[in-house]
Design a protein with these regions (language model features):
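Long, well-ordered mid-to-C-terminal structural blocks that present hydrophobic/aromatic surfaces
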Residues: 304-385
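Loop-rich catalytic cores of soluble enzymes, especially ATP-dependent carboxylate-amine ligases
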Residues: 162-333, 337-338
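Short glycine-centered, acidic/aromatic-flanked micro-motifs in structured strand/loop junctions
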Residues: 130, 209-211, 347-349
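Structured core elements
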Residues: 75, 206-208, 344-346
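Short, aliphatic-rich beta-strand segments
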Residues: 128, 286, 344-346
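Terminal catalytic/cofactor-binding subdomain
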Residues: 2-11, 19-24, 32-193, 201, ...
């Protein structure tokens, strides 16, 4: 449900902009006509083939892999009373002109000094979406500077950023109630409390990578999934929620994986091969085989029945879906890896105190060369289906731990491909080895 950074792919001027897909509430509610093939958003979809073509053009834009972006998300707390419920007025005051319009409708929503855009989630979590860069070093510099700017603004208002992937102090509480968030809360409430936990009490780190060329697509798509379980375990950072230990290394991923599996879980068969026949077809099929979470009507949001989006196209009842409906549906698909014209890796917990660079560097190193990525995927096949064990047990799961060790060692060997300076590289290596050999989480606990 979070917003991805500015698209990390460089495309020729004729390419359709990757950010036409609305992801956040503000973009979903203000999206104008679709720009894909000049199809007006209000055009009815009467043929599943047309929908499939649209999904392909929106979600898979191929080209040389060059750029990387991150989204950094945190829970927000009062510095001296971290368990105190957050007042949205205090958060809006702290953010000033950087506040999104979902929080302050009259805000200019200015970017931070180095270009990062601030958004706010339903529970008051704050996130920075970075501009894409062709250099991990540049990304580290600009994102770190924007984090400092954000931290200073919050500090002046008596607020601070959280350090884990779940709110360790407070139960989930929705403080933003626009149309999209209200509809999403109602839809997920039909399946229990996990929706509220996800919307209002979690914080993640998203790393966005180019899809790659047509030739690279299958490898990069498969690798993004196959690396998931060991990286979840290696960077698990949410063992506590609302004042109690949950028994999960990553309570955040436990919530996501079980929330609405057709929409949020990993692919049913992640071991279908390092080179799946057609990731575009697989994703398109999943989108069309998933029911809409909610539908936007002139009279307000409507919660539909169990019919899938593909069935809605075929029946055309109570009205045919439009491309605006399909855009909205795509924005409510929340799998661990989401194609948005680039690959959005969504399975990492928020990291504390600038340590987001560690998982970002690992992924950048592994994805820098196809040969490295092939080696990486070949070492993790035994753990490929262990999403839930990775989230629950972290590095205490021996199969996942073995895969994590292999990935970390390979990444350390290939960090030179990231262009990071020696000092940062040394920091990354030390952090990885500390977690692997001491089995420690960033918050200092052990498993």
């Amino acid at each position: 449900m979070t917003k991805a950074p500015h698209p990390p792919s460089a495309h020729p001027p004729s390419a359709h902009p990757p950010d036409v897909l609305p992801v956040t509430a503000e973009s979903a509610e203000s999206a104008g006509p679709s720009v894909v093939a000049d199809v007006p958003a209000s055009t009815a979809i009467v043929d599943p083939t047309a929908a499939a073509g649209y999904i392909t053009r929106i979600c898979f834009k191929t080209g040389p892999p060059r750029r990387i972006g991150v989204e950094l998300e945190w829970t927000v707390h009062y510095r001296d009373q971290p368990a105190r419920p957050l007042d949205p007025a205090d958060l809006a005051t702290a953010l000033g002109g950087h506040a999104p319009r979902t929080l302050r409708p009259t805000s200019p929503h200015d970017p931070l000094p180095h270009g990062g855009l601030v958004t706010v989630e339903p529970g008051g979590q704050v996130e920075i979406s970075t501009p894409p860069t062709e250099s991990l070093t540049t990304l580290h510099q600009v994102a770190s500077a924007d984090v400092v700017a954000l931290t200073r603004r919050l500090d002046r208002a008596g607020l601070r950023l959280g350090r884990t992937g779940c709110d360790p102090f407070r139960p989930p509480r929705q403080i933003l109630r626009n149309r999209r968030y209200t509809a999403m809360a109602a839809a997920f409430a039909r399946q229990g409390r996990a929706g509220a936990d996800m919307m209002c009490g979690t914080a993640g780190l998203q790393v966005c990578l180019d899809t790659g060329s047509d030739r690279q697509l299958s490898l990069r798509w498969s690798a993004a999934h196959l690396l998931g379980p060991p990286l979840i375990a290696l960077f698990a950072n949410s063992p506590t929620r609302a004042g109690r230990r949950t028994g999960w290394a990553s309570s955040r991923m436990a919530t996501w994986l079980t929330l609405d599996p057709v929409r949020t879980a990993a692919p049913a068969d992640p071991t279908a091969g390092v080179r799946p026949a057609d990731p575009v077809a697989d994703w398109t099929r999943r989108v069309l085989d998933t029911p809409p979470l909610f539908v936007d009507e002139p009279t307000g949001w409507r919660l539909p029945g169990p019919a899938t989006f593909g069935e809605w196209i075929r029946t055309g009842t109570p009205r045919p879906p439009t491309y605006a409906d399909l855009d909205l549906h795509l924005s409510t698909m929340f799998p661990p890896v989401r194609p948005r014209g680039y690959l959005e890796l969504r399975y990492l917990d928020a990291q504390p105190d600038g340590e987001w660079i560690v998982p970002a560097a690992v992924l950048a190193a592994l994805f820098a060369r196809d040969e490295t990525l092939r080696t990486a995927t070949s070492t993790v096949m035994d753990a490929a289906d262990r999403w839930l064990p990775a989230a629950r047990d972290g590095l205490a799961d021996p199969v996942v731990a073995a895969a994590a060790h292999s990935l970390a060692e390979l990444a350390c060997e290939r960090l030179t491909d990231t262009g990071l300076p020696d000092e940062t590289t040394s920091t990354v290596v030390r952090a990885l080895r500390r977690r692997l050999h001491q089995r420690t989480y960033p918050w200092g606990g052990t498993r």
